[in-house]
Swiss-Prot record:
Gene: leuC
Family under the similarity heading: Belongs to the aconitase/IPM isomerase family. LeuC type 1 subfamily.
Protein's UniProt name: 3-isopropylmalate dehydratase large subunit
Lineage of producing organism: Bacteria, Bacillati, Actinomycetota, Actinomycetes, Micromonosporales
Family annotation (SUPFAM superfamilies): Aconitase iron-sulfur domain
Functional pathway: Amino-acid biosynthesis; L-leucine biosynthesis; L-leucine from 3-methyl-2-oxobutanoate: step 2/4
Source organism (scientific name): Salinispora arenicola (strain CNS-205)
Enzyme Commission number(s) of this protein: 4.2.1.33
Co-factor remark: Binds 1 [4Fe-4S] cluster per subunit.
InterPro entries: 3-IsopropMal_deHydase_lsu, Acnase/IPM_dHydase_lsu_aba_1/3, Acoase/IPM_deHydtase_lsu_aba, Aconitase_4Fe-4S_BS, Aconitase_4Fe-4S_dom, IPM_dehydratase_rel_enz, IPMI_cat
Keywords, sorted A to Z: 4Fe-4S, Amino-acid biosynthesis, Branched-chain amino acid biosynthesis, Iron, Iron-sulfur, Leucine biosynthesis, Lyase, Metal-binding
Protein residues bound to [4Fe-4S] cluster: 363, 423, 426
Function according to Swiss-Prot or TrEMBL: Catalyzes the isomerization between 2-isopropylmalate and 3-isopropylmalate, via the formation of 2-isopropylmaleate.
Domain of life assignment: Bacteria
């Protein structure tokens, strides 16, 4: 491939160089794309563009679609299970149209689709890894800002816009300016009860929502190495929340163990060859990054956001900050607006904040490990009176696994709603939304104004904190139970 060099390189530089098919001075590099993920929201206009130009999908074998953003995750109607794949379950006309359009486009252009009711349906960034489609060293794109999730495997994965979706569909390539690189060096070990979600929220609070802008970030250090693949995906998933183009973690035995035997992973001698190559995907000892950040994992405690962006967060033991204490006027102004929207007063203890809704799910924390963590806390307890708790698996496979382990019974016996797979309350594009003024503890990735429903107030938390909060009715950690 164009761009191969013997100079010391970072992980990101190695993957980038292996995919450059054309490079010219003063122009973006043209990258080959190994995997293109689609969903119903950002793909319709891209397919329309192909149709107007008389083009086909260049590599349907490298393209996969699912239905996730607009899909309902369940109703009180007991027949919902049997009607799961029926479009009649989608009551919103816009959502229904988007689902119908995706199905029609995939059928016309020969794209693999996992629709509602399919055994592999789920959130796009959950099903890619669980099917073994996501692999180290790949380039992966999707018309979705949390595509960086796949970087947990040592893939270069990033979100793209609709016009870029069309370009990849038509050519299986994408012109991209070469990004800068950054290392996040996580020193020390996480304390018991502190999760990957706490780590990444603490990182974003430290560097700010623009701290990674223009960079491909590599997360490094012993604390990262000790994380499961689910934990690593949580970290990589939120790379965009501090401005990074992508986030990557070098593959290792944990990665290989996760992928081994999955449906689309290499097998036999191909597996051995793949692992041999994947082992080369590490940053060279003498390679340099354009920027570096250090985070001390040993000092992190359960973390929660108080404002309206993921960088406005603090340890659960802290209080809502006073805007005047912040360093710059833009920060102070943003904090004032956030406190007004969130209906919070400076100095209020975060543990004193009562919630109306608790949401466990999303492409950040909707995997089996996340559900186990929430169930472990919830076991033997009841959801507080007046609190609604939704537990939404990230995929049909996760749901099936959870039910095989009896997690669904723990949730329902505690008074939580056990629902079907989808993006759900992560965003206000389906029936699972907050009402105006409702306050939620959510394991999702964004706490923007109106993100979970017009006028809804979101506090980002880990699955254990979410479960403890559901029991107490106020922001809490498992240690409080």
């Amino acid at each position: 491939m164009v761009g191969v060099t013997s100079e010391p390189r970072t992980l990101a530089e190695k993957v980038w160089a292996a995919h450059v098919v054309r490079s010219a001075e003063g122009e973006p590099d043209l990258l080959f794309i190994d995997l293109h993920l689609l969903h119903e929201v950002t793909s319709p206009q891209a397919f329309d563009g192909l149709r107007l130009a008389g083009r086909r999908v260049r590599r349907p074998d490298l393209t996969i679609a699912t239905e996730d953003h607009n899909t309902p995750t369940g109703y009180a109607d007991p027949s919902f299970r049997s009607r799961r794949g029926d479009l009649l379950t989608i009551t919103d006309p816009t959502s229904r149209t988007q689902i119908e359009t995706l199905r029609r486009n995939c059928a016309e252009f020969g794209v693999r689709l996992h629709p509602l009711g399919d055994k592999n349906q789920g959130i796009v960034h959950v099903i890619g890894p669980q099917l073994g489609l996501t692999q180290p060293g790949m380039t992966i794109v999707c018309g979705d800002s949390h595509t960086a999730t796949h970087g947990a495997f040592g893939a270069l994965a990033f979100g793209i816009g609709t016009s870029e979706v069309e370009h990849v569909l038509a050519t299986q390539t994408l012109p991209q300016a070469r990004p800068r690189t950054m290392a996040v060096n996580v020193v020390g070990d996480l304390a018991p009860g502190v999760t990957a979600k706490d780590l990444v929220l603490a990182l974003i609070a430290q560097v700010g929502t623009g701290g990674g802008r223009g960079h491909v970030v590599e997360y490094r250090g012993e604390a990262i190495r000790k994380l499961s693949m689910e934990g690593r995906m949580t970290i990589a998933n939120m790379s965009i929340e501090w401005g990074a183009k992508a986030g990557m973690i070098a593959p290792d035995e944990t990665t290989f163990d996760y992928l081994r035997g999955r449906p689309n992973a290499p097998a036999g001698t191909d597996w051995e060859a793949a692992v041999a190559y994947w082992r080369t995907l590490t940053t060279d000892a003498d390679a340099t990054f354009d920027a570096e950040v250090t985070l001390d994992a040993s000092r992190i405690t359960p973390f929660v956001t108080w404002g309206t962006n993921p960088g406005q967060g603090a340890p659960l033991d802290a209080s809502v900050p006073h805007p005047d204490e912040l360093a710059t006027e833009p920060e102070r102004a943003a904090a004032r607006r956030a406190l007004e929207y969130m209906d919070l007063a400076p100095g209020t203890a975060l543990r004193d904040l009562a919630v109306d809704v608790v949401f466990v799910g999303s492409c950040t924390n909707g995997r089996i490990e996340d559900l186990r963590a929430a169930a472990d806390v919830l076991r033997g307890h009841r959801v507080a009176q007046g609190v609604r708790m939704l537990v939404v698996p990230g995929s049909a496979v996760v749901r099936e696994s959870a039910e095989a382990e009896g997690l669904d019974k723990i949730f329902t016996e505690a008074g939580a709603e056990w629902r079907f797979a989808g993006c759900s309350m992560c965003l206000g594009m389906n029936p699972d939304t907050l009402l105006p003024g409702q306050r939620a503890a959510s394991t999702s990735n964004r706490n923007f104004e109106g993100r979970q429903g017009r006028g809804g107030r979101t506090h980002l938390v880990s699955p254990p904190v979410a479960a403890a909060t559901a029991v107490t009715g106020r922001l809490a950690s498992p240690a409080d139970l």
